[in-house]
UniProtKB/Swiss-Prot annotation:
Topological relation to the membrane, as annotated: Multi-pass membrane protein
Entry similarity comment: Belongs to the UPF0060 family.
Transmembrane domains' residue ranges: 7-27, 33-53, 63-83, 87-107
Protein name: UPF0060 membrane protein Mmwyl1_1139
InterPro entries, per the entry: UPF0060
UniProt KW keywords: Cell inner membrane, Cell membrane, Membrane, Transmembrane, Transmembrane helix
A cellular component annotation (GO) from this entry: plasma membrane
Superkingdom field: Bacteria
Location in or out of the cell: Cell inner membrane
Length: 110
């Protein structure tokens, strides 16, 4: 089940990146404490480390990761921001995930 492992790793990576970007947003836009920058930096460090765990060429990982990031950002919109995604948000996420699957799981000769 390497596909499930890859997708799970992408989802965890996206969550770390989103949290690492959301916390400074809270400080800058919502007037929250500057101390949020500490966990934000740690989250972005974890994000970077997680990217190194993907078992394929970095360019392919970055390209495919973008599809999962889009999906996770739409989930964040729904769960954290409390905004229900539109049909177009869901279709766009599905297309992005399809692109990720093609990039990551298509047969290749090495």
């Amino acid at each position: 089940m390497p596909e499930l492992k890859t997708i799970s790793l992408f989802m965890l990576t996206a969550l770390a990146e989103i949290i690492g970007c959301y916390l400074p947003y809270l400080w800058l836009r919502e007037g929250k404490t500057i101390w949020l920058l500490v966990p934000a930096a740690l989250s972005l460090a974890v994000f970077t480390w997680l990217l190194t765990l993907h078992p394929t060429a970095s360019g392919r990982v970055y390209a495919a990761y973008g599809g999962v990031y889009i999906f996770m950002a739409v989930l964040w919109l729904w769960i954290v921001d409390g905004i229900r995604p539109t049909t177009w948000d869901m279709i766009g996420s599905a297309v992005a995930l399809l692109g990720m699957a093609i990039i990551m799981f298509a047969p290749r000769t090495t």
